[in-house]
A protein has these predicted regions:
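Basic/Trp-rich segment in TM-proximal cytosolic loops or flexible interdomain/linker regions
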Residues: 43-44, 103-191
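Structural detector for helix-capping/boundary residues
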Residues: 58-59, 76, 95
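Catalytic donor-sugar/metal-binding loop of nucleotide-sugar-dependent glycosyltransferases
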Residues: 70, 79-98
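Short, hydrophobic alpha-helical packing/hinge segments within bilobed ligand-binding/sensory domains
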Residues: 78-79, 108
Length: 191
């Protein structure tokens, strides 16, 4: 661990070649490890813990008052809390863990749905602390974690709002279109 108090690993996919779903997960974790955590580590900012492949010192556990992370995405909750506390999570590309990924679309959908619910929980519980840490303490890591967490939430909420708005517009314009249709039919019948 080179003296680091918290270290995350390279998360690899055990069943990468099973099908397109497992390969997709493998590519997702390559992106997360090599294109997010490696540059974060290079810049000496905090990385994100993902899954079970991480370690932390007893000092960290004592400082946070024991393991108090029980949301659906406890790894992200742990990351957000440490970032708010100004703790750095390092990345070790040589520490490789192998995860078995879902092989069916339904399994993947269930897991992704759980992750989205977990993101919402983390934003609700830790989002304010991340914003405060970013603005008051000037922590880039807090901004980084917000940008990795909030977009999923924002996109979900925005798509919900757009769907409701389009439904309302559809209901209003459909009535107008029906009035135009019946007026045209009536005028055609009279003439």
């Amino acid at each position: 661990s080179s003296g680091e108090q918290v270290v995350t690993s390279y998360r690899n996919t055990k069943n990468y070649g099973d099908n397109w779903i497992t390969a997709g997960y493998g590519l997702y974790f390559i992106r997360e490890s090599e294109y997010l955590n490696r540059p974060r580590d290079f810049l000496h900012t905090s990385c994100a813990v993902s899954g079970t492949g991480f370690l932390f010192s007893q000092d960290i556990l004592d400082e946070v008052g024991g393991w108090e992370y029980f949301l659906l995405t406890e790894d992200l909750e742990f990351t957000a809390d440490l970032v708010c506390r100004g703790k750095r999570i390092a990345y070790c590309p040589d520490a490789v863990i192998y995860d078995e990924q879902p092989t069916s679309f339904v399994q993947s959908l269930n897991q992704r749905s759980r992750w989205v619910k977990g993101y919402l929980q983390v934003v609700a519980k830790r989002g304010g602390g991340l914003v405060k840490s970013m603005l008051a303490d000037g922590r880039f890591a807090a901004f980084d974690m917000l940008m990795c967490t909030i977009p999923a939430v924002v996109i979900t909420v925005l798509s919900l709002l757009v769907n409701v708005a389009m439904f309302i517009v559809g209901m209003v314009t459909a009535r107008d279109q029906m009035n135009i249709f019946f007026t045209s039919v009536t005028l055609a019948a009279v003439n």
